[in-house]
């Protein structure tokens, strides 16, 4: 049966016991929420550790019985028959514990800024961007998260040329972070009279929502411009300069916001997006430096990388990073089966982490 770092397990169990004891004392409501959240994360792994140790003890007893010359043949045969299943159970529990002990991404519990932009393919790309947004909106709803569109530029035939939304909920970044990249669709557009399959694309960016303490943005580094909000075809939709464009001069990152009639609200939303983009750009730079000699095929997060193809004629979705194909496109694009892709990507990423840990890197 696989071995585990017993000292780490003891620390984990001690932390769990300390939290349970502290819950019995007089604590603030805020502290109570923090503790119950941590306990809910620890409970499954603590149970796995206790079960693993019980299996380990049972295997030791069986091995002693098998090795004992005084054990009769029938009992030895029963013990030898029972041991493989126990060993497999122990290995299964050990793997679960190893995954739980992996270093956590500090951003995993953050809310998310979700940005979807139509790419090549004209109106069809905008329609596809709309499909992707609804897919994530439905998936978020199934997780109990809240989705709020902050900025949207609608396509001529529907969908979106670009949409930015905030996804609020526990573990939003952990679930959605592998969705960044180019999503490609192959289907026959409604406007296609010859029945030909067209290929279009949309780019998805998933950014952990940055807090003010994460990014130091100096006022002198910002160029802030106000203007009248523009409607379809360039018409003015109001007579006040409520639209805001903020440029972060050092990075060249630009955010335009005009969805609210309130300049104050547009400015706050623009700063929130700008903060997340600057923070994400720095994280991307650091991650690129760290992975210069080691490629994580799932977690690269390269926005120019084609990560997934949605083929409507064949009813399939293929994730190119892990070579996984699901023949349930309607369920995936509806958001109901998206979790199957996300779970597979998470498992692959964890396997890569475990391999790195095992290699002593």
From Swiss-Prot:
Methylated by PrmC. Methylation increases the termination efficiency of RF1. It comes from Nitrobacter hamburgensis (strain DSM 10229 / NCIMB 13809 / X14). Residues 288-307 are annotated as: Disordered. Keywords: Cytoplasm, Methylation, Protein biosynthesis. This is Peptide chain release factor 1. HAMAP family: Rel_fac_1 (MF_00093). One of its GO terms (cellular component) is cytoplasm. Pfam families: PCRF, RF-1. Coiled coil: none annotated.
């Amino acid at each position: 049966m696989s071995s585990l770092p017993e000292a780490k397990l003891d620390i984990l169990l001690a932390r769990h016991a300390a939290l349970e004891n502290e819950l019995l004392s007089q604590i603030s409501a805020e502290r109570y929420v923090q503790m119950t959240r941590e306990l809910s994360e620890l409970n499954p792994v603590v149970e796995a550790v206790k079960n693993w140790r019980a299996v380990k003890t049972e295997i030791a007893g069986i091995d002693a019985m098998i090795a004992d010359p005084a054990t009769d043949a029938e009992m030895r045969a029963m013990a030898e028959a029972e041991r493989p299943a126990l060993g497999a159970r122990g290995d299964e529990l050990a793997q679960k514990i190893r995954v739980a002990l992996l270093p956590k991404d500090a951003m995993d519990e953050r809310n998310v800024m979700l940005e979807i932009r139509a790419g090549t393919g004209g109106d069809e790309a905008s329609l596809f961007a709309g499909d992707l947004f609804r897919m994530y909106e439905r998936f978020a709803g199934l997780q109990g998260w809240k989705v709020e569109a902050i900025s949207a530029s609608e396509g001529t035939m529907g969908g979106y040329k670009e949409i930015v939304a905030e996804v609020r909920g526990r573990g939003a970044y952990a679930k959605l972070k592998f969705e960044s990249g180019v999503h490609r669709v192959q289907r026959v557009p409604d406007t296609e009279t010859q029945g030909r399959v067209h290929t279009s694309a949309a780019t998805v960016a998933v950014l952990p929502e940055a807090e003010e303490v994460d990014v130091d943005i100096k006022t002198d580094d910002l160029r802030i411009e106000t203007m009248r909000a523009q409607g379809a075809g360039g018409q003015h939709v109001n007579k006040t300069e409520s639209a805001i464009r903020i440029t972060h001069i050092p990075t060249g990152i630009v955010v335009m916001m005009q969805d609210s009639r309130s300049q104050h609200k547009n400015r706050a939303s623009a700063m929130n997006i700008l903060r997340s983009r600057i923070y994400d750009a720095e994280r991307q730079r650091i991650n690129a430096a760290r992975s210069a000699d080691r490629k994580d095929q799932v977690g690269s997060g390269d926005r120019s990388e084609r990560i997934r193809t949605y083929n409507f004629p064949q009813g399939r979705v293929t994730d190119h990073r892990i070579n996984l194909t699901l023949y349930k496109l309607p369920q995936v694009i509806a958001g109901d089966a998206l979790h199957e892709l996300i779970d597979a990507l998470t498992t692959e990423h964890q396997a890569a982490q475990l391999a790195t840990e095992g290699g002593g890197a």
